[in-house]
């Protein structure tokens, strides 16, 4: 059970796809950046049961809801803190992670109509942190050879690769997600490795819907649904 406000920010398919794309082991310490109300840590716990998960979020109200969800679900290995990813000095005092996951704000601060609700605007627009802040913070928080898994928009892929390399995080794997066959991708999943060697793998693309509008078998499997029903 996840505590969220009815009129607040809600998680979507992006969080589910990111948790599926991430390679997490039981021995791993995981940090989820821009965690919001904590959906990705709870999905990772249900799927992989890692040793420890820390969610970092700048909005105190979201952190409070996430910690109450952890208490409600009796997940003792998940915790949440309020911190600004631009506060690099504070980040250096946090125990480093084997894996970082992040579903960051997608929209540039000067792009599109900004939501009048500050909380929703911060979740969707690069107001409190931008893509470079996220990747620089990841460099600090990752162990040597640790991995970052990010979900974003395809139009930002060039920025993601450029910034990862700037902070010595090597892009290792990319997967495009399309609404359906014949449509341009609208989601990109990226894996990077701190101080990794140069080798990039492309996963087969994912299609969310079939031609008839039904949900694809691939997506049903990711959600744990029986595709034979």
Tell what function each PLM region has:
Residues 47-48, 93, 182-186, 200:
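A generic structural micro-feature
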Residues 184-229:
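SAM/dcSAM-binding transferase cores
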Residues 9-11, 34-37, 182:
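Short glycine/threonine-rich catalytic loop with a Thr-x-Gly-x-Asp
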Residues 2-4, 128-179, 183-185:
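Conserved Class I SAM-dependent methyltransferase catalytic core
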Residues 104-133:
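Mobile active-site "lid"/loop adjacent to the S-adenosyl-L-methionine
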Residues 21-113, 136:
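Conserved SAM/SAH cofactor-binding pocket of Class I
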Residues 1, 52, 77-79, 170-173:
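Conserved beta-strand segments of alpha/beta enzyme cores
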Residues 1-25:
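Class I SAM-dependent transferase core
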